Amino acid sequence: MDGFCRPIGQKGAPMYAVLKSFGLKGLNGFPVEVEADISGGMPALSIVGLPDSAVRESGDRVHAALKNLGFKWPDRRITINLAPADVRKTGPVYDLPLLLAVLAASGQLEPPPKDTAFLGELALDGSLRPVSGVLPMALEAAAGGVRALYVPAENAAEAAEACGSEMQVYPAATARQVVDALRGVQPILPTIPVPFDPADAWSHVPDFADVCGQPLARRLPGILPPLTREEAVETTKIYSIAGQMPAGRGLVTARPFRSPHHSASSAALAGGGAQFRPGECSLANCGVLFLDELPEFSRESLEVLRQPLEDGCITVSRAAGSATYPSRFQLVAAMNPCKCGYYGHPTRACTCSPSAVRQYRSRVSGPLLDRIDLCVEMDPVAFDELHGAAPSESSAELRKQVLAARAIQAQRYAAPGYEDVRCNAQLTAGQVRRICRMTPAAEQLLRASYETLGLSARAHDRILRVARTIADLSGKRLLDEDSLLEALQYRAQEKVDLTF
């Protein structure tokens, strides 16, 4: 038999069924076999295989849904095993396969084929509710040879993005629809994947042409290149696991913009929790993470940023295990010069003492400042600038310049040895020295600056990456003095005197 073996030759003989489902571990899915065994004894339901509370409660949901759909609940002892038994199972994703396994083991449903899998949460009336993390589980299903995947209707567009030439995704609003489809009574039409098109990725982003004293950070995604399909899949996996995918949505096509409040904890930024959910650093992957009032964040929260800024990923470790999430984002931070906000203001007097200013600025550690490439001091906007300023360059015009520079970098990093590099920011220390070639005058300037400013090795490499990007925007092959001076100017703010 395809999906189960059911020896029922004698009264009281055990009945058994097994169905295929999937779970989540970190950013990826893993296969789970849902086994149902019905045997003699006092009526009872037992779920084993390291289930969490949501999985243990699924027995009550399945019992109610099965009865409300008109099926018979077996009046015997039922044991459900979720294999592999040494991996913790979380969430309500196993409700649908659990119900079908009970029906199959009790002889009310013929066994589904081995290459069929099921995901979905049950309501008490038998309707299906969407679940988190469908895309990574669907990708694992497609890679594991599954040909038919049944999911809640609201998850179908997302799951269909994992479809290849072999696997089909079938949307269902109720468990009854799944049963009828398996019986051949009422087939379900598969969901057709929507072609990937990031053309509208900038439609919701404010334009740079309107900027005059208004927030710049929120406009930054509007000048970044569109997401590649690989980046879109990775970003969608993160949002799906975090439960932040809109219903009926396929892939995320716009670069994320995240702006957490300064009261956010380190766990909110890094991620984690009982079920290992991505934090703000991962939700900003391939996009922008904006931290306003930077010194107001707790020291513990700010230090969380070190690993993702350096490695492009973040590892969350808890007693239940560990998970690594991609966290390659552009960090944009803003802060006042002091607590009252008027230190150095041309017309307003600062009310802070020197020690208060020193204490306020010291909340941002040196190692974190060392990882910030561009530091710019913003002056107050005058009245005449607000009312008489000429329009700024539009986001579309700026985007053309960015895309031209990215095209240069794409051609450069198409060479062997740069498979993991898409742009200058991703260069390793060794690659920086090979790629960032300088004129003799520029090299002499960098040597003098390194010794005079006491730069770290990390700052040295970051200056070269920024200078290389400035040169790309200008179409220069070698780093000259102008490119290097501009990059050094952006680093000058890290030498702001914090001790007076």
What are these regions (language model features)?
Residues 32-38, 269, 373-377:
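Short beta-strand elements
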Residues 54-59, 72-74, 81-91, 276, ...:
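Basic, amphipathic alpha-helical bundle interface domains used for macromolecular binding and assembly
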Residues 61, 65, 98-101, 137-140, ...:
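Alpha-helical scaffold elements adjacent to nucleotide-binding pockets in ATP/GTP-utilizing enzyme cores
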Residues 106-108, 184, 243, 312, ...:
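Short glycine-centered helix-capping/turn motifs at secondary-structure transition points
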Residues 147-152, 168-172, 226, 289-291, ...:
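Short hydrophobic alpha-helical runs that function as membrane-insertion/retention elements
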Residues 216-362:
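Conserved ASCE/P-loop NTPase catalytic core
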